[in-house]
């Protein structure tokens, strides 16, 4: 993480430049696309039972309720090295097997245009009786 090295066994590492991924998961509620940091949540290796208890709160951004094994950092560069040959990395829905992964925020930015009042940092809310059953 930038110049800091953390050596441990991890069950999960989520690098977030936005709030949501994969069907509404929000691992780091404070992640923003426009703040210049890569919110990186590291979850230490835990037993299956503990991990299953963690998934619900993780999906809602409540990792902070588990400080013994979940910490969030805000680096600009993340390098992950694994001694195991079968580490699976998912990047925007694409899975790759690799031992070394480096993720860095780009200095180059993209401008997005949207309707008035639209923000990449807001949460969409369903309104109306026909949307309540989604």
Q: Which ranges hold each PLM region?
A:
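Long C-terminal subdomains/extensions of small-metabolite kinases
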Residues: 1-134
């Amino acid at each position: 993480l930038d110049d800091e090295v953390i050596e441990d066994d991890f069950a999960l590492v989520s690098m977030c430049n936005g709030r949501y991924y994969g069907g509404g998961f929000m691992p780091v509620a404070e992640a923003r696309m426009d703040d210049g940091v890569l919110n990186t949540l590291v979850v230490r290796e835990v037993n299956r039972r503990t991990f299953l208890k963690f998934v619900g709160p993780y999906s809602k951004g409540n990792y902070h309720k588990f400080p013994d094994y979940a910490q969030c950092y805000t680096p600009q560069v993340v390098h992950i090295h694994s001694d195991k040959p079968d580490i699976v990395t998912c990047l925007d829905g694409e899975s790759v097997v690799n031992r070394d992964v480096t993720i860095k925020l780009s200095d180059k930015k993209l401008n997005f245009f949207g309707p008035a009042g639209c923000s990449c940092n807001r949460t969409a809310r369903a309104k109306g009786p026909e949307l309540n059953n989604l």
